[in-house]
């Protein structure tokens, strides 16, 4: 028996070290299989959320799971588990959850890891001194009475010498009898770690905004706004965070959020992306039209109206502008945030009509043919903003003097012409918002609106600017922060997007004063409340957490027969989930 265990420890350590060395060389990414039933992967980011109370964000850890079953077996398991609920903070939106190992098997693997690192085990065929490997964390199936969902082991090193190991046990239960006494927790921590003083630190998270997933036919939105508060000391369990807390807003917004007021502007951006993709790839996937009339009819009516006018005066421009954006009026009235520009020029009004009605390349060619013919005949002399470098603007300016270049409407030219006027229009829309709200100056926005880069790059930057606008509008509508906070958020977003590609999954963090947001949380119940107990040895913790959704993405929980507890104060009743982290130190010498 002992020889078999020794050999298992040697083999497990050797395989972990091989993976560790390959990862350092950048050669290993996929999990490796150990003894047919276990898969192991070394990760440094994307750690399960429940472990982030223990690990630093960029800590490397070995993540141990059960091997994913073959397709046939997996489908059978999924059928059996179809009515179970397991909400994942790590992989929201995915249908396949990680597979957990039986608790007994997990303990065996933790034992092998600990045994291999023990310098007293000199009989093992492991080169001395033993190389310290990253922590090992094993997903557990919660089959024991305590509901263990994670087991972990982390080495204690002193001057690169392994001195011991910290063993972690993380449990999760769906339990109505979640009451816990703070003093009892402190007493247990003191006894476990033989200390006389304990520090308690509190944490609470409030969900300020989450999209309503009312339509099962579309993918759920990932828009969320939460408020995190932390404080010390903690006076009682489920304490409302005091005004002396450290607070931060966490904001993640998906463009096109239905409860925002930018649906029409977002559609214009989507149409812009369609044109850009068509130029880049040669394939154009047109959007469904907003208008019942054909694009050609729509543009012909527009030109006829202009042709009847002796001059294109301000009052007419305003009437045309209102007509062009009437389907967005309800959103504008609702928000009172975005003032529709009253100075749309000919090209911008043309964009509004064509972006809502064009459904084919032939539509583009016919519409631009009609426009160029009207310009050549002098039927219209449209008004334009200064500063545009679009091809259509150049042709219009030439038409003022009775001589226009001949432009063949073939290849990507029609796409490029419409893309250019769309870029001009959207840039002015965004500038109007940021400047009028005093959230950014033209200098701040120069990176996003500069015409000195390629058209494709301009599209990417405008897309970033739109995402910033979506973030701000969600906050203005539902959080109503003070102007100084909005300004700080704007500058933070601008700084991020000057250095990074578009990422709608990115969470923007904004430090805030609790007094400035107290109305958002003091009368509410948190979606997550946690207390962390520690002593002078900060690595040794006891953590108790209550949440209104399971933070474990690989287990289902038996729900006892009781009316489910409402933790978040909504009309919808939910089960409370209690997590408990305990740890113990084992010293090798």
From Swiss-Prot:
GO terms for biological process: cell division; mitotic spindle assembly checkpoint signaling; protein localization to kinetochore. Keywords: Cell cycle, Cell division, Centromere, Chromosome, Kinetochore, Mitosis, Phosphoprotein. Pfam families: Zwilch. InterPro entries: Zwilch. The keyword Transferase does not apply. GO terms for cellular component: kinetochore; RZZ complex. Belongs to the ZWILCH family. Component of the RZZ complex composed of KNTC1/ROD, ZW10 and ZWILCH; in the complex interacts directly with KNTC1/ROD. This is Protein zwilch homolog. It comes from Mus musculus (Mouse). The gene is Zwilch.
């Amino acid at each position: 028996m002992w020889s078999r265990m020794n050999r298992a420890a040697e083999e497990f350590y050797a395989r972990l070290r091989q993976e560790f060395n390959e990862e350092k060389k950048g050669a290993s990414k996929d999990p490796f299989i150990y003894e047919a039933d276990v898969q192991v992967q070394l990760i440094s980011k994307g750690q399960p959320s429940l472990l982030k109370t223990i690990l630093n964000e960029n800590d490397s850890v070995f993540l141990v799971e059960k091997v994913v079953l073959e397709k046939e077996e997996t489908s059978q398991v999924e059928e059996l588990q179809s009515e179970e609920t397991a909400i994942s903070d790590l992989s929201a939106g995915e249908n396949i959850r990680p597979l957990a190992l039986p608790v007994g098997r997990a303990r065996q693997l933790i034992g092998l890891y600990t045994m291999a690192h023990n310098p007293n085990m000199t009989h093992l065929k492991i080169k001395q001194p033993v190389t310290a490997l990253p922590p090992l964390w094993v997903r557990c199936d919660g089959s024991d009475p305590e509901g263990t969902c994670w087991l972990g082991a982390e080495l204690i090193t002193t001057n690169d010498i392994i001195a011991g190991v910290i063993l972690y046990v993380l449990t999760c239960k769906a339990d109505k009898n979640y009451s816990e006494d703070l003093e009892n927790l402190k007493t247990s921590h003191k006894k476990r770690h033989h200390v006389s003083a304990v520090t308690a630190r509190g944490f609470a998270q409030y969900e300020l905004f989450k999209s309503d997933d009312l339509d099962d036919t579309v993918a759920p939105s990932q828009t969320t706004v939460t408020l995190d508060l932390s404080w010390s000391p903690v006076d009682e369990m489920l304490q409302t965070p005091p005004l002396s807390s450290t607070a931060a807003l966490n904001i993640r917004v998906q463009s096109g959020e239905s409860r925002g007021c930018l649906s029409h502007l977002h559609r214009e951006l989507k149409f812009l992306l369609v044109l850009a993709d068509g130029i880049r790839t040669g394939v154009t996937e047109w959007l469904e039209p907003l208008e019942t009339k054909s694009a050609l009819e729509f543009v012909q009516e527009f030109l006829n109206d202009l042709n009847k006018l002796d001059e294109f005066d301000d009052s007419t421009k305003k009437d045309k502008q209102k007509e062009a954006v009437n389907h967005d009026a309800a959103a504008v009235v609702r928000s009172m945030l975005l003032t529709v520009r009253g100075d749309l020029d000919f090209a911008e009004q043309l964009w509004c009509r064509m972006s809502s009605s064009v459904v084919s390349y032939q539509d583009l060619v016919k519409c631009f043919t009609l426009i160029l013919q009207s310009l050549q005949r002098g039927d219209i002399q449209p008004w334009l903003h200064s500063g545009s470098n679009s091809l259509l603007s150049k042709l219009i300016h030439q038409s003022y003097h009775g001589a226009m270049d001949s432009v063949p409407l073939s290849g990507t030219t029609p796409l490029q012409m419409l893309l250019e006027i769309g870029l001009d229009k959207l840039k002015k829309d965004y500038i109007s918002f940021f400047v009028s709200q005093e959230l950014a100056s033209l200098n701040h926005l120069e990176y996003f609106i500069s015409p000195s880069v390629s058209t494709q790059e301009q599209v990417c930057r405008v897309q970033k600017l739109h995402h910033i606008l979506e973030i701000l509008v969600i906050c203005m509508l539902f959080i109503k922060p003070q102007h100084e906070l909005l300004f700080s958020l704007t500058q933070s977003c601008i700084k991020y997007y000057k250095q990074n590609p578009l990422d709608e999954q990115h969470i923007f963090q904004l430090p805030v004063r609790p007094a400035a947001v107290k109305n958002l949380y003091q009368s509410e119940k948190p979606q997550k409340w946690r207390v962390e107990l520690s002593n002078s040895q900060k690595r040794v913790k006891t953590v108790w957490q209550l949440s209104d959704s399971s933070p474990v993405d690989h287990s289902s929980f038996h729900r006892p027969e009781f009316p489910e507890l409402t933790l978040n104060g909504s009309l919808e009743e939910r089960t409370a989930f209690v997590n408990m982290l305990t740890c113990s130190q084992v010293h090798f010498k």
